[in-house]
């Protein structure tokens, strides 16, 4: 952003950069190979953008999303409900938020939310296009890590144990 730039100029540059990135990454063809539209792929990338604590987590979060979609499980991504609340600087979800029938409440709805919830960066788009290999269905902040990374598992009991450790550490794990 340069001094004197208007909002319109900044937005035009952002759109041009995104268009260039999407063309370079062949999002049309590669999304289709994943069984998604480009818009759905950008929605997945936006979820990754909001959820991943580290760059290393991005492809793993992508894999969890795709695995849960394949299993017809709700995504249970709290960031989608936080998007609706529009609370800058963090979000604390209430029981009412989690019970909401909002189309963005992926706790109780299957499939992707109706729109992206953030503007994904290139790393999140690449992760959506290149998910890690794995059978994971769950992830939670890793209470033993200090870098914002997550613990990934396919086992609900392991997940519940990791979530309990996360809560004990005061990390606000759902």
Range-by-range predicted roles:
Residues 1-174:
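Bacterial extracytoplasmic/cell-wall-associated proteins, especially those involved in peptidoglycan
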């Amino acid at each position: 952003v340069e001094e004197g730039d208007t909002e319109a100029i900044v937005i035009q540059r952002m759109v041009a950069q995104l268009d260039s990135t999407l063309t370079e990454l062949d999002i049309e063809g590669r999304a289709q190979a994943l069984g998604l539209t480009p818009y759905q792929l950008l929605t997945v990338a936006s979820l990754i953008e909001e959820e991943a604590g580290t760059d290393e987590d991005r492809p793993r979060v992508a894999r969890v999303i795709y695995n849960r979609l394949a299993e017809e499980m709700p995504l249970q991504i709290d960031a989608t409900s936080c998007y609706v609340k529009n609370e800058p600087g963090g979000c604390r979800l209430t029981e009412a938020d989690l019970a909401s029938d909002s189309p963005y409440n992926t706790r109780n709805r299957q499939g992707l939310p109706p729109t992206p919830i953030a503007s994904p960066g290139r790393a999140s788009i690449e992760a959506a296009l290149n998910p890690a290999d794995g059978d994971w269905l769950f992830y939670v902040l890793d209470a033993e890590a200090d870098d914002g990374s997550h613990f990934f598992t396919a086992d609900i009991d392991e997940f519940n144990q990791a979530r309990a450790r996360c809560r004990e550490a005061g990390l606000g794990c759902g």
